[in-house]
Amino acid sequence: NVSKGDICQAVNNGAGDMAAIKSCTRAATGCGGCSALVKQVMEYQLAAQGVEVKKDVCEHFPWSRQEIYHLVRVNHIHTFEQLISRYGQGHGCEVCKPLVASVLASCWNEYLLKPAHLPLQDTNDRYFANIQKDGTYSVVPRMAAGEVTPDGLIAIGQIAKRYQLYSKVTGGQRIDLFGARLEQLPAIWRELADAGFETGHAYGKSLRTVKSCVGATWCRYGVQDSTGLAVRLEHRYKGLRAPHKIKMAVSGCTRECAEAQGKDIGVIATDKGWNLYVCGNGGMKPRHADLFASDLDEATLIRSIDRLLMFYIRTADRLQRTSTWMDNLEGGVAYLRQVVLEDSFGIGEELEQEMARIVDSYQCEWQTTLNDPQCLALFRSFVNSDQPDEAVQRHELRGQPQPLPAEALPEGELPSRPWQAICDLDAIPAQAGIGARLGERQIALFRFGDRVYALDNREPGSAANVLSRGLLGDVGGEPVVISPLYKQRIRLRDGWPCDGGEQAVRAWPVKVENGKVWVGSQQLLARAEAS
């Protein structure tokens, strides 16, 4: 329970960035939903003190998100290493790596698990699924506009039963399957792909769904085919990476059953065409969408959405929804109409071409993964064992599998030998991590530059063995892993948290001989002193 006064007091005491605010107040260290508000309060208090509020994304880049986008686009930069070597410093962090990954995807739309891009991906984008509190993942196949055939429903049901997945219908008119272990994801998706499904991008800062009513095809009140348009929009914009997630909806009449006026892009049918609404939002701070244009034909509607979305991608801040973007846009909706509808900057055709390249280069990330044996090898809980994670336990509730409350399990036995050969060095992705077993103990191996580190795999403060799936980076030059669930920054050399707290992670000695990674069975006991 952190108040505005607590944040203001922290700023008065010298906390000048989000890392410092999180460390001394613990604000925005839970679900992260309040991060934008905390940042706004911090910046307001800094400005009240006469302190210049910098828009630098983090310590590694003295640039705003908009500036990074233009650096990437204008200079044809295709990798994080190219960008940081020319315009940044250090090794990156949990802020700049996903940000740059998103910008690169928005510009060039390359496969996220290419070796140059994999280290930038947070766990959801790295494994193309949404991580849950116990370290398992949820799977969401695409159902454009909520349409699904009887055979498709049967296939989903059979897959859920076969892999003991909890099934739930989402607010976006599709089905979410919970509880998939990391190593099960490829098999689940191979069956889904065989049944005609593709990824629903529920894990990405991208288009989620285009919700719709049944429209004029079935409904006596419908005046246009809302489902048909929603299917077209969803297939056009699927996979589009943006500063934040994008939700759309299409209603077939003014009764508004699809709730289009609460979406980033909303479309409502009229007798003459379609009304376009923009920058609506539900969630923590609801915002009613603005009427942007009326009675558009379908071609003009799509052209307007193309331009608006690409302009949003160019100009929004990091993790800024369209609703907040609009509220902070000088000139508001009138200015946006000038840019998009009247082409006041003369960039309309350019924005359309950028969108066309994204549409033309679409790929189902899971289909690409299933066709690549090297990428499939990354989808395993342990690089040297097929044994499943013993911490993942289930019981039945309301006829479905549910996670058991977390309990402390006895730690696995360590090997009797002083050193255990774990894997080949090349089995650990560069600048990333992978899970392993030291005897029966779960550990995380990290390949940072030319060194390999080993820590316990349990994320502090959780019951999930997921630390190996965290991002690697540095804090003031100190190599760290950023935990995937709660974004805790943990030093690689000794397992100590960088942001305060005394709950350390055990570290284990590592050596690399003839391309083989060995881990010692005697943990590193002493806390390493800061150099």
Predicted features along the sequence, with ranges:
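C-terminal accessory/binding modules appended to enzymatic or scaffolding proteins
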Residues: 1-18, 51-80, 133-135, 151-156
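Flexible, glycine/charged-enriched surface loops at secondary-structure junctions
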Residues: 80-82, 98, 112-116, 165-171, ...
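Short flanking/linker segments adjacent to small metal-binding domains or redox-active Cys/His motifs
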Residues: 33-47, 82, 88-106, 307-331, ...
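Rieske [2Fe-2S] iron-sulfur-binding domain
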Residues: 427-531
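Mobile "lid/hinge" segments at catalytic clefts and subdomain interfaces of large enzymes
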Residues: 252, 256, 261-320, 335
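Short Fe-S-cluster ligation motifs
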Residues: 17-41, 54-76, 87, 128, ...
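Local cysteine-cluster metal-coordination motifs and their immediate loop/turn environment
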Residues: 1-8, 22-43, 54-65, 88-101, ...
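Small-residue-enriched alpha-helical segments and adjacent helix-cap loops
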Residues: 37, 59, 137-275, 291, ...
